[in-house]
């Protein structure tokens, strides 16, 4: 049965359309296999829906705001970007398990984290079709950032097994110069382009 939480209001920025901040927490009885960990979240396969994963925020990793507020804002920003046509790792609901708050999101099988790729901790496949998809999606994201004049705080991506690039874990979306965000996209695009140039030699 859903548990209702009174998450605090989310700060608004000029020009950003007002998307209702979700505040309802759904208690889940269990989580599946652990898929990985980031700087703030532990990620598990969902037992409620095999197409989803559960991203639980670890305590004391969100600074001065609560885990509830942090998760609600990330869910809100993800939905806002999706409404603007950006490719995102879709997020569906706020959840609670084992006294931790989190988000139910799409489970991207065999996903690569863009930060791992950009910092040479992992390598994307050299397959031509894969890298063409990465470049196409990067170009689309750059175009939309320019069109909407957006800066995405802590911009990062997951790349699926076909080279499709999706924005993941957006911390904030601000109406501002997009150049810093575009530079981040170009880092990933350059790696895919280099793979294509190497393949053409």
Curated annotation (Swiss-Prot):
Predominant subcellular localization, coarse grouping: secreted
EC numbers for this chain: 2.7.1.-
Domain of life: Bacteria
Role summary: Effector protein that targets and inactivates the plant molecular chaperone HSP90 during infection. HopBF1 is recognized by HSP90 as a host client. As a result, HopBF1 phosphorylates HSP90, leading to the inactivation of the HSP90 ATPase activity and chaperone function. Phosphorylation of HSP90 prevents activation of immune receptors that trigger the hypersensitive response in plants. HopBF1 is sufficient to cause severe disease symptoms in plants infected with P.syringae.
Effect in UniProt of substituting residue 88 to D: 1000-fold decrease in catalytic efficiency
Keywords: ATP-binding, Kinase, Nucleotide-binding, Secreted, Transferase, Virulence
Written domain comment of the UniProt record: Adopts a minimal and atypical protein kinase fold.
A GO cellular-component term linked to this record: extracellular region
UniProt keyword Secreted, yes or no: yes
Source organism: Pseudomonas syringae pv. syringae (strain FF5)
Binding site for ATP: 39-41, 106, 108, 113, 156
Top-rank EC class of the record's enzyme: transferase
Phenotype upon changing residue 41 to A: Loss of kinase activity
Protein name, UniProt field: Type III effector protein HopBF1
Note: HopBF1 is specific for eukaryotic HSP90, despite the fact that the target Ser is strictly conserved in prokaryotic homologs. This mechanism appears to have evolved to prevent phosphorylation and inactivation of the pathogen's own HSP90.
UniProt-annotated catalytic positions: 154
Cellular compartments annotated: Secreted; Host cell
Catalyzed reactions: L-seryl-[protein] + ATP = O-phospho-L-seryl-[protein] + ADP + H(+)
Family statement: Belongs to the HopBF1 family.
Gene Ontology MF terms in the entry: ATP binding; kinase activity
